[in-house]
Design a protein with these regions (language model features):
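Aromatic (often tryptophan-rich) hydrophobic motifs at membrane interfaces
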Residues: 75-83, 94-99, 206-316
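Short, high-confidence coil segments that cap the C-terminus of an alpha-helix
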Residues: 38-40, 105-109, 218, 273-276
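Conserved acyl-donor/pantetheine-binding loop and adjacent beta-alpha core of acyl/acetyltransferases
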Residues: 59-78
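Non-catalytic accessory segments adjacent to catalytic cores
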Residues: 91-135
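A conserved beta-strand-loop-helix scaffold within acyl/acetyltransferase catalytic domains
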Residues: 2-48, 52-64, 116-138, 144, ...
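Active-site/acyl-donor-binding loops of N-acyltransferases
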Residues: 9, 31, 58-61, 126-148, ...
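Short catalytic-loop micro-motif centered on adjacent basic/acidic residues
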Residues: 110-113, 172, 279-282
Length: 327
């Protein structure tokens, strides 16, 4: 049966369809669409008029420390969502991937597939479309089969949580637009000063509130001390798993309150209480590079495992060179 691919560039044109993968949802598309610096596209695959799969990509502006300094990169979380159990997932993915590559390279210097659930999925299709793999690491906490989220924490982490609370810090879920604005401004300052990771416009979090938080597909947690937000975390929920997308705390100014630690602790505890099976930390780095954030989250009892990311550059000579190096 021939597969029909439809590409959507406007959220208003996307029909409502079933699915549980937030990273390939209409709601996340609309958040990207409404956030400055992002251009989303969604590919819908259908057979006999029925949707069978979808793949969401977001093109964003990126500033680099080496030429070209300003680029557009296309990011995809996972390898799509498949809506029927009998679907030939890899074949469908192969067709969506070829179509996405053609579409995205018109406006992007780089395409990146990240946070893959199965590192081997779609291998031959990535290779046939001239992508190259880079080994990566993932860290996630298993939350099922334990009495509480703290069961696998290191003893020092437990002590820090108790000290932070004893020293006046309070942790709760953000519930107002003002709290979300203060949280995002605080975290933007932290990311720009010491974390080499993209941080979106404040509008991203405001629309996360209206599109995802109200439907319990996301939450923002805040750490307060004397009515000031000094830390926080943002989580997205997809299927049976939780994902910690952004987190941080003003640890130098408020060292005795351990705001960064409390922000992660609250996210893990809430995910466990709400029955999620895992909490995955979204960006823990390359396997051969010392990574302070990875070392930090591992002390919450998570397990480290190998995965990969797939990349494709627009410049053919550069892409061919990296294929020779990486494959």
């Amino acid at each position: 049966m021939p597969l029909k691919l439809t590409t959507y560039y406007q959220g208003s044109e996307i029909p409502d369809f079933p699915g549980t993968n937030t990273f390939h949802s209409k709601e996340l598309f609309q958040i990207y669409e409404e956030t400055p610096g992002y251009t989303p596209l969604l590919i819908m695959a259908s057979e006999d008029g029925k949707p069978v799969a979808r793949l969401l990509a977001a093109i964003r502006k990126s500033i680099r420390m080496f030429p070209p300094a300003f680029i557009k990169r296309c990011e995809i979380y996972g390898t799509g969502e498949y809506l029927t159990a009998e679907a030939d997932k890899e074949r469908i993915f192969g067709e969506m991937l070829e179509h996405l590559t053609t579409e995205a390279l018109r406006n992007s210097f780089l395409i990146e597939f990240r946070n893959l659930e199965n590192a081997m999925f779609g291998y031959k299709y990535f290779r046939s479309n001239r992508y190259f793999p880079v080994n990566w690491l993932r860290v996630r906490n298993s939350l099922h089969g334990i009495e509480n989220a703290e069961q696998r924490f290191s003893p020092s982490r437990i002590r820090q949580i108790k000290k932070g609370l004893k020293n006046g810090a309070k942790v709760d879920e953000a519930r107002t637009v003002e709290e979300i604005r203060e949280f995002s401004n605080m975290l933007r300052h932290l990311y720009s000063s010491r974390i080499r990771k993209h941080f979106p416009n404040i509008i991203f979090f405001q629309h996360m509130d209206t599109r995802l938080i109200h439907s319990r597909q996301a939450k923002i947690f805040i750490v307060r001390y004397k009515d000031k937000i000094i830390g926080g975390s943002a989580c997205i929920y997809s299927g049976n798993d939780a994902y910690l997308w952004f987190s941080g705390g003003m640890r130098k100014t408020y060292a005795l309150q351990y705001p960064g630690i409390l922000a992660v602790w609250k996210a893990l505890r809430d995910a466990h209480q709400n029955g999620f099976r895992h909490m995955e930390f979204m960006d823990v780095g390359l396997p051969f590079k010392k990574h302070g954030y990875r070392d930090f989250v591992l002390r919450f009892g998570g397990k480290q495992s190998s995965t990969r990311r797939w990349f494709r550059f627009r410049w053919q000579w550069l892409n061919d060179l990296l294929i020779k190096i990486c494959v």
